């Protein structure tokens, strides 16, 4: 499970979360993440999952994302380990370049 709303964020924090997974991040958008960061604890790691990837790592990082979860952008049923490995290398390179 993940969070989207400020209420969900603070409920998770109240329950002891030491990081927040925003899912699906594509519904939040970078501008809303910037707004949420204004009220969240400054040391809270924020992970974006769903609708994120190499094409938008940079804009999410600028908005305050700490990290990302990649699902279907990395693996689709039936793909060989070789294909997944090449995708993973490409994703890591894009992340490193976005830093």
Question: What kind of region is each of these model predictions?
Answer:
Residues 9, 21-29, 63-87:
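Glycine-rich phosphate-binding active-site loops on the catalytic face of alpha/beta enzymes
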């Amino acid at each position: 499970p993940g969070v989207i709303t400020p209420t969900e964020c603070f409920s998770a924090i109240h329950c002891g979360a030491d990081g927040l997974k925003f899912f699906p991040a594509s519904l939040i958008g970078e501008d809303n993440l910037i707004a949420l960061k204004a009220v969240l604890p400054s040391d809270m790691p924020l992970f974006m999952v769903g609708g994120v990837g190499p094409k938008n790592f940079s804009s999410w990082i600028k908005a305050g994302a700490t990290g990302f979860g990649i699902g279907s952008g990395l693996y689709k049923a039936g793909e060989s380990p070789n294909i997944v490995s090449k995708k993973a290398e490409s994703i890591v390179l894009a992340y490193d370049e976005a830093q």
